Amino acid sequence: MPDRLVPATLARRDDGILVSPEYGELPRDASHARAHANRMLAGTGLPAHWRGRRTFTIVETGFGTGSRFLATWAAWRDDPARCERLHFVAIEPHPFARDDLRRAVSNFVADTTISENADALLDAWPMHVPGLHRLEFDAGRVVLTLAFGDAHDMLQRLVARADAFYLGNLASAAHGDVLSADVIRALARIAADGATYATHSHDDAVKHALEQTGFTSRDVEDGAGEPALRVGEYAPRWRMRRHEPPRALPVASREAIVIGAGLAGCAVVERLAARGWNITLIERHEQIASEASGNPAGVFHPLMTRDDNVASRLTRSGFLHALARWRALEEAGHAFARSTRGMIHLAESADDFARMRDAFDALGAPSDYVSLLDTDAARAHLNLPVAHGGLLFPHGGAVWPAGVCAAQIAAAGERVKLLAGTEVARLERDRDMWRAVDAASATLAEAPVVVLANAGDAVRLAGLRHVALQPVRGQLTLLPPGSTAPLPCPTIGDGYAVPLDDGTLLIGATFEPDDVDRTMRTAGHIENLERVRHLLPGLIGELPDVDTLRGRVAFRWVVADRVPVIGPLADEAQGVANARALSGAKARDLPRAAGLYGAFGYGSRGLVWAALGAELIASQLEGEPLPLERELVDAVDPARFLIRALRGRQIG
C-alpha cells in the first residue's frame, strides 16, 4: 500500500498568530524569521562553503514553510562568488497546501528578493503526491528537490552527495522523531567528506548519534540571546560505507554524443545543454522525430495501482517531471501543441473499475492529480453512453511528440550540432574518448560521453548480450473531420481516441509484437475501429471505405520487464570475467562502460519517461542529487539484466 500524504494544517489564533500542529507557532516578525534562517546558513559555513564550486548540495530534514530555503536562495543570489548550480533537497512528511503555504510565507517576506522568490516557489509548488518533486528556479541554477514522505524512508531512498545539512527540530507526534539515530545514519550515508551541519536540537541522543556516525559536534553562541546552535562536520575516523555518495563523471571536456533524435534523445540534449555541455546529436533519418516520435499525437498519463508498484511510481514521477519541463520550455518561448482539457482512462469492465477505485482510494491523491468518475459522471463528461466509469487526469492529455523534440532542440541552441541522415556503424573507445564511426570507418564525432537513445539499435551499438529489446508494431488510424461525434478530451481504455486540432480523430493503436512490416493494413484500421466503437459507443458514425483511411505505422521497442533502460551501461565483458565474485552483487557494485549511457526501451511511454530519463542521466553525469528514489533508479538501471544473469548462475 502507498504511504498517503497527510498535509500540514494552518490556523490563526485569536491573537493573530498563525499556528500549525506540525510546526507550532509561526514567527510573526519577518526580520526574526530571516535572522533565524540565516543562523542556519552561517552554522554550515555558508556562503563561503559554496564559493568556487560547480555544484553545491544542501539537504534539509524538514521543509516546513520554506523559510530556510528562501533565505538560502536569497544569500546565493546576493553572492557574486556563488556556486554555478545550487541543489536544495528537503524532506517533508507533511507539506502545506499551496494556499496555507502562501499564508505561512507571508510572515517571512521582508524584502523584494524574498518576495520574488516566495512567489516563484508558490507558483511551482507541486501536487500532494508522495515521491520526489524537482523544481527549478533562476534558469535552472537553483534546484529544489522536495521529498514528500516519511523522513527516514525518503532519506534511505535518496541518492545524493550532501555538502551541508540543515537539521530541523520537528519532534512532534505528527512528524515523529525526524532526528532519530536511523535518520542520522541515513544522513551519514550521503554526506560528503567535510559536509557541515547545523541544528537547534540539543538532545543528548541526537548528539550521540551524530558522533557515532562520524560527525563532530560543538555549540556556537551568537551573543544575541538566542539558544546556542549545534554545528559540526562529517569527519569519520574510519570508513563505514560500502558505497560512497555519487560523484561527477571525470571528463576532459563537457562534450557528449547523443545517438537518436526522438523523444529520448532530444530530452537528453536539452538537459545536458542546460548544464553547459556541448552535444553532437546524430540521427539516421533526415528529420528529427521520424520513428514513433513522429506520430501526430501521443497520449500522456500516469499509471495507478493499489500497491503503488514500480510502474506506478515511475510513471507518476515521469508524468509530473514532464509537466514541469514542458512548462519551462513554454515559458522560455518554445511552445508546442498539447491538449489542455485533461484525459479520461475508462475502465474496460466492472472489475476493472473496482481496481481503479481501489488504487484511487489507496493513494488518496488530490483532485489536481486524479479524480474518480462513476459511470454517470463519465457519460456526462464525454457526452457518450459509455459502459463504465474511470479516472480523470486533469493534466493528462495528448501531446505532439515532434513538437516536444523541436522545442528541446531549440532550447539547446548553439550547444547542439545535429548530424541528420547519418548512420553510426559502430562505437570505438580510444583512451578516454568515444568515437562514433560510419560504415566507411570515417569518424563522425568524438566525446568522452555517449548516450544511446536510438531504441532498438542501441543494443547493437553497445554490444549488449544481456539486454533484450522487442519491436512492437503499432498502426494508428486517422478518421476525417465530420465523421465522428465531438470528443471533449483524449480518452483511453482498450484502445484510445484523440481529437486533433483540425477535427481529425486519431484512434489506435494495434499491438503486434515482433512484426516489423511498415505496410499500412486494412485489418489494422478495422481493429482500431472495433476497439474504439466498443470503448466509446456513438462516437464513430458512417465512414467512407476503410481502405481509403489514412494512418501511420511506427515501432515501439519494449524490454521484457516493461521498464525503460536509463543510466550508465554495464561493462558486460568485465562483469562476465568476474562472475563468481559478482554473483551476490548489487547494481552499484557492477563495473560500468566508462562514459556510455542508455536511454531506450521506452515502449509506448516515451512522453512520460523521456524528460525524467534525461534528467536522471544528466544528474548522474554531474554527480547531482538524483530525481528518483534509489529503488526506482535500480529499476531502470541498464545493469539489472546482467545482475539477474549473475544471480541466476547463467554466466560464469
UniProtKB/Swiss-Prot annotation:
Residues 1-235 are annotated as: tRNA (mnm(5)s(2)U34)-methyltransferase. It holds the Pfam family Methyltransf_30. Its EC number is 2.1.1.61, 1.5.-.-. The keyword Ribosomal protein does not apply. GO terms for molecular function: flavin adenine dinucleotide binding; oxidoreductase activity, acting on the CH-NH group of donors; tRNA (5-methylaminomethyl-2-thiouridylate)(34)-methyltransferase activity. It is found in: Cytoplasm. SUPFAM superfamilies: FAD-linked reductases, C-terminal domain, FAD/NAD(P)-binding domain. Residues 259-652 are annotated as: FAD-dependent cmnm(5)s(2)U34 oxidoreductase. GO terms for cellular component: cytoplasm. Keywords: Cytoplasm, FAD, Flavoprotein, Methyltransferase, Multifunctional enzyme, Oxidoreductase, S-adenosyl-L-methionine, Transferase, tRNA processing. GO terms for biological process: methylation; tRNA wobble base modification. It catalyses: 5-aminomethyl-2-thiouridine(34) in tRNA + S-adenosyl-L-methionine = 5-methylaminomethyl-2-thiouridine(34) in tRNA + S-adenosyl-L-homocysteine + H(+). Its cofactor is FAD. InterPro entries: FAD-dep_OxRdtase, FAD/NAD-bd_sf, MnmC-like_methylTransf, SAM-dependent_MTases_sf, tRNA_MAMT_biosynth_bifunc_MnmC, tRNA_S-uridine_synth_MnmC_C. In the N-terminal section; belongs to the methyltransferase superfamily. tRNA (mnm(5)s(2)U34)-methyltransferase family. In the C-terminal section; belongs to the DAO family. HAMAP family: MnmC (MF_01102). Catalyzes the last two steps in the biosynthesis of 5-methylaminomethyl-2-thiouridine (mnm(5)s(2)U) at the wobble position (U34) in tRNA. Catalyzes the FAD-dependent demodification of cmnm(5)s(2)U34 to nm(5)s(2)U34, followed by the transfer of a methyl group from S-adenosyl-L-methionine to nm(5)s(2)U34, to form mnm(5)s(2)U34. This is tRNA 5-methylaminomethyl-2-thiouridine biosynthesis bifunctional protein MnmC. The lineage of its organism: Bacteria, Pseudomonadati, Pseudomonadota, Betaproteobacteria, Burkholderiales. The gene is mnmC.
